[in-house]
Each structure stands twice: as C-alpha cells, then as structure tokens.
A protein has these predicted regions:
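Conserved NAD+-utilizing ADP-ribose enzyme module
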Residues: 1-94
Length: 94
C-alpha cells in the first residue's frame, strides 16, 4: 500500500495550522484544514497569498494517520485540498 504524504502550513509562533474558515448560517464559522499534496505547492501558496508572513510559517509533512488524529484533536470540520495554489483552487472534504 502506498502512503500519501500531505503537507500543512503551520505557524512558528503559536503552532496553529493554516485553515479555511467558512461561515455557517447563524453567524458561526467552521474550519477546514488546508492540505497540500506537494511541499512546493504549500510554498507557492505562501509566497503568492502571504509573502509578508513567510518568515513566520513552516511546512510540515504528515501521514494520513497523523492527519486524522490532528483533525480530531483540533476539532476541524474537515480538510480542504489545495489543487492549485496560485488561483487558489480548493476542494472541501468533510
């Protein structure tokens, strides 16, 4: 079985992960963890959309098992796969 490694963007300062916040009815927000399939996609996303914060962010690799436990621990609604970091094009998965 092949192991698909995923890449996340994390803050060096407080350890929080980069998420997409989606508003729900009633004013609440849900968070989706941004997941990249390649490390260079994550770096492109940072450079394109948050270049001024690049020195405060790092790329972290995670296995599918780590991703599952991380999502449970932080209470994310799902994850969002970034398929094109420049536009960005994102697929939300609950």
């Amino acid at each position: 079985m092949l192991l698909q490694i995923n890449y996340l963007v994390r803050s060096k300062r407080d350890g929080k992960y980069l998420v997409a916040r989606v508003p729900e009815e009633g004013g609440a927000e849900v968070s989706y963890l941004l997941v990249f399939q390649q490390d260079y996609d994550a770096m492109s996303y940072i450079n394109t959309h948050g270049g001024e914060f690049s020195n405060r962010l790092m790329i972290e690799s995670v296995s599918p098992m780590q991703l599952k436990s991380l999502m449970q621990r932080w209470g994310y609604t799902g994850f969002a796969i970034v398929t094109d970091p420049l536009l960005p094009n994102i697929q939300f998965v609950s």
